[in-house]
Design a protein with these regions (language model features):
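Phosphate/ribose-recognition catalytic cores of enzymes acting on nucleotide-derived substrates
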Residues: 1-171
Length: 171
């Protein structure tokens, strides 16, 4: 799997933009149920391939399911300290209302910016409030012209053989 040379993104995070493509797998089952904020999760195999310099934390960008419309997204990368996860995860909340789950679908994501580091929370309410603030901040950030351009990036229309996970950076 090729990983292209990294560059410094406009907001200072190395290795961005980061382009990810993989199958949506079942997560921990808490996004929709406990938090009311559904997420699409990448496989452990894909998570293990992300660049080491991508720190744990909350990111924003664009996402598309099964080559459908491109929507804003916010993504948590890390160990989710509140839940004391034993495995690193990438959980993508797509800012769009879907009528049903889409496990097994192909998810394409372009990670563009960093919002905050991963942290622990004292309560579930505090966690949900932080996630809602992340969603609002991501929504506002993606209205910037330099980020809006990525909504129509060729990555979202590339015809790539099914079943191939992709992690790549572009200069």
């Amino acid at each position: 799997m090729p990983v292209f040379p990294s560059k410094l993104s406009p907001n200072g995070v190395k290795c961005l933009p980061l382009f990810l493509r993989g199958t949506v797998v079942k997560g921990f089952g808490r996004g929709s149920k406990q938090l009311g904020i559904p997420t699409a999760n990448f496989s452990q195999e894909l998570v293990s391939k992300i660049p080491a310099e991508l720190d744990c934390g909350v990111y924003y960008g664009w996402a598309s399911v099964n080559d459908g419309p491109v929507n804003k997204m916010v993504m948590s990368v890390g160990w989710n300290p509140y839940y004391k996860n034993e495995k690193k995860s990438m959980e993508t909340h797509i800012m769009h209302k879907f009528d049903q789950d889409f496990y097994g679908a192909m998810l394409k994501v372009v990670v563009l910016g960093y919002l905050r580091p991963e942290k622990n929370f004292n309560s579930l309410d505090e966690l949900v409030s932080a996630i809602k603030a992340d969603i609002q901040n991501a929504d506002e950030s993606l209205n910037r012209e330099e980020w809006r351009l990525f909504k129509s990036h060729k990555f979202f229309t590339e015809n790539i053989a099914n079943g191939i996970d992709i992690v790549r950076q572009e200069t």
